[in-house]
Amino acid sequence: MAESSKVVHVRNVGHEISENDLLQLFQPFGVITKLVMLRAKNQALLQMQDVSSAVSALQFFTNVQPTIRGRNVYVQFSSHQELTTIEQNIHGREDEPNRILLVTIHHMLYPITVDVLHQVFSPYGFVEKLVTFQKSAGFQALIQYQVQQCAASARTALQGRNIYDGCCQLDIQFSNLEELQVNYNNDRSRDYTNPNLPAEQKGRSSHPCYGDTGVAYPQMANTSAIAAAFGGGLPPGITGTNDRCTVLVSNLNADSIDEDKLFNLFSLYGNIVRIKLLRNKPDHALVQMGDGFQAELAVHFLKGAMLFGKRLEVNFSKHPNITPGTDSHDYVNSNLNRFNRNAAKNYRYCCSPTKMIHLSTLPQDVTEEEVMNHVQEHGAVVNTKVFEMNGKKQALVQFENEEEAAEALVCKHATSLGGSIIRISFSQLQTI
């Protein structure tokens, strides 16, 4: 164990955790004199008034797991005995004002274009240039104002705010760049001082230092490009090299499952070609995905998922495809396949089943009560929220556990609510 210190090192500090959250966690143990947020590392350094206060805090948290906003954080003594101004400058993020802002967008449930960002940031001054890109930190943008004061005003007003209700949270820093270079005017980069730039982009970012890819989402067809949709790399355990398109699903609840319910679940990870329930093994099914990468996503995210009281086994099949026939259901031309247009943005939302489902294409006059009544037969609804984005009604519904949410999704996706055929997917939000 590190030597006792009045400086506490806190890890796993997510972007949703604020300075006030940390202060509230440690204030019962004494006076806090300094706090440095290390946003790039998801860490923080917190200095108590004396060593005994820090010791009391760490002794308490040895037996009690500290949690902030549903996230476990981990505490230990820092190697620093005291936080100095120099150390804060080294560890803290760059705060020297500049007319260029670096914006990271967290909880990005919906695609963000330069037009959306321009609408958000232009009220604070003339935006000269704007570039978006993917990095390991997530979806980011560089926004260049005409004058520094406008950038400072935008940062003060927008830091921590959401572009859309409940998601797309802005984390804003001053960039150390002096000038943005923009080569193309399209939905990923824009030079508002030069409207005559071409729109075509040749698979490179507008500036090689900005991001790993500038390829348009509809063009993403290879593993490296798809990786960008996940924030710069594929999820742990995903190789992107699988070429087997068919998966074998076993331990199904034969009394509750059918082809359409399997389609509703597996179509979250790719386009479905065919599904076949094995009549001689009623708790088994074959699902043929659009390609090997989509099949790999399905195996990765659904293996071990609970559905209708059964824990699913999902593995690659020895069969390369499902032969068309009366005993298989064909979905190749279904308009309910989710990856036909803007496919890559859908990869970004792939995840294991969660407690939260997202409903879209809802009727404009839908109420929270109507949404809850539509799905509550599948489990205990903890919370419901109806909101509007781009003039269209959507909703989030939180269940007590992942199995209930999965049952609601497989049973109610593509059903009618108020005359509208609704779409349902898992949301990665933790709470509403």
From Swiss-Prot:
One CC-aspect GO term: nucleus
Residue ranges of the TM segments: none
InterPro entries given in the database record: Nucleotide-bd_a/b_plait_sf, PTBP1-like_RRM2, PTBPH3_RRM1, PTBPH3_RRM2, PTBPH3_RRM3, RBD_domain_sf, RRM_dom
One BP term from GO: regulation of translation
Pfam family, one: RRM_5
Nucleus in keyword set: yes
Assigned keywords, A-Z: mRNA processing, mRNA splicing, Nucleus, Repeat, RNA-binding
MF annotations from Gene Ontology: mRNA binding
UniProt-listed SMART domains: RRM (SM00360)
Function statement: Plays a role in pre-mRNA splicing. Binds to the polypyrimidine tract of introns. May promote the binding of U2 snRNP to pre-mRNA.
Protein's recorded name: Polypyrimidine tract-binding protein homolog 3
Organism: Arabidopsis thaliana (Mouse-ear cress)
